[in-house]
């Protein structure tokens, strides 16, 4: 019995030992749960306060709504049952993976330590975090509003500065235009008529009352008009100078022709230099001047007039860049006439060296040049102002030469191979046969194609 008693006394002890041994993994797992990273996360003030707020809201919702509370309690009971069953079945697996779980827990705790260092607000309650976030957002919005206000003030100052600068530039430009391109008589008359009206300010006051774009548009239009008038005046001066040179040269050529014929001078009016030669030709012996001296002076006068005319025509050619080709052709014709005259007197040492035919051709060239100058100015006056404003007012128009057309190819395309049906006919018979074949069956001939419109600088003005 004693032995059985010992066995009975030892059996419970052994069973207790086995139970304690079976409970040891559970105790170690409890210690692991105490050091679990999840517990640390839940213990954070921010998370704890948030969970408390959510729990209180959940409980109050269950109390206010009985049906919702019953459903929630049923769900809680189901979740607890499922969790208990899952833990009972997962206990062997957790015991088997205890070393790995400990390693993962250690790494997670280290990461949580670093996260707490970088995010101090995790140690603060949720209401404090929300308050600080509101303050931060309010400060950011206030800063953005201040920045927008400063930007608006800066843009206003920039706009005023730009307006003042543009007013200054426009004022200087208007003064320069008034100084270098003064108003014409027609514009002065218009201003005088406007000044007679009631309550009309000065030109400066009217300009100050106008807007920037209005002033800029009026300045550009006025500058274009004044530039047109200025350029037209220069062309008129060049035209008058060229015509004066041509008139003097014509009188000189007439003098040379009379001197070659031995005729007496006519008492008509002549230019000053030519008048002197006309006066010295008849009484040359009385004044002690020989016939050869007068001839040399006449040739010298002809060369000087030709040189001056060449310079005037060169200046006129420099002013016609950008003009229509017809106007440039007139100036080129004048240049050719002057070059021919210069070649006529280049090698002459006396009046006998100038051939009468060359002299007659020279007079004809001078007459043609005089007519070309008149036609040139008429072409300029009929042309639009803008196309021929060159230099600082508009870019120079450069005409591109078109490639030459192969006439043989065009003839082959138009004529084509002869029709073998009409090979035995002469040309008039072939023409009549072709007209009869190409005629309309109704008895009306086909309308010939219209010619291509003439190319102009401004097609919209062609009617």
Curated annotation (Swiss-Prot):
Any one Gene Ontology MF annotation carried by this entry is: identical protein binding
Q: Where is this region: Interaction with LIPE?
A: 1-123
What switches on expression, per the entry, is described as:
Up-regulated by fasting, PPARD, PPARA and PLIN4. Increased in muscle of high-fat diet fed mice. Induced by unsaturated long chain fatty acid in muscle.
Q: For this UniProt record, give its keywords in alphabetical order, as a comma-separated list.
A: Cytoplasm, Lipid droplet, Lipid metabolism, Mitochondrion, Phosphoprotein
Q: Region labeled Disordered — which residues?
A: 1-32, 433-463
What segment(s) does the record annotate as region Necessary for mitochondria recruitment at the lipid droplet surface? 444-463
- Phosphoserine occurs at 17, 163, 337
Biased composition annotated in UniProt, kind: Polar residues: 17-26
**Which domain of life does this protein belong to?**
Eukaryota
Phenotype seen when the gene is deleted = No visible phenotype. Mice lack detectable lipid droplets in heart. The triacylglycerol and fatty acid content in heart is lower.
* Any one of the GO BP annotations: lipid droplet organization
Explain the post-translational modification.
Phosphorylated by PKA. Phosphorylated on serine in skeletal muscle at rest or with lipolytic stimulation.
Q: Name one GO cellular component term.
A: cytoplasm
- Does the keyword Mitochondrion feature in the UniProt annotation? yes
Cellular location(s): Lipid droplet; Cytoplasm; Mitochondrion
Just give the chief location class: other
The yes or no answer to whether the keyword NAD is present is: no
InterPro entries in the cross-refs:
Perilipin
Tissue and organ expression note? Highly expressed in oxidative tissues, including heart, liver, brown adipose tissue (BAT) and slow-twitch fibers of skeletal muscle. Lower expression in epididymal white adipose tissue and anterior tibialis and quadriceps. Expressed in adrenal glands. Isoform 2 has the highest expression in heart.
Q: What does this protein do?
A: Lipid droplet-associated protein that maintains the balance between lipogenesis and lipolysis and also regulates fatty acid oxidation in oxidative tissues. Recruits mitochondria to the surface of lipid droplets and is involved in lipid droplet homeostasis by regulating both the storage of fatty acids in the form of triglycerides and the release of fatty acids for mitochondrial fatty acid oxidation. In lipid droplet triacylglycerol hydrolysis, plays a role as a scaffolding protein for three major key lipolytic players: ABHD5, PNPLA2 and LIPE.
Task: Name the protein family.
Answer: Belongs to the perilipin family.
How the protein assembles, per its UniProt entry? Homooligomer. Interacts with PNPLA2; prevents interaction of PNPLA2 with ABHD5. Interacts with ABHD5; targets ABHD5 to lipid droplets and promotes interaction of ABHD5 with PNPLA2. Interacts with LIPE.
**How is this protein named in the record?**
Perilipin-5
Q: Species name for this entry?
A: Mus musculus
**Upper taxonomic classification of the species?**
Eukaryota, Metazoa, Chordata, Craniata, Vertebrata
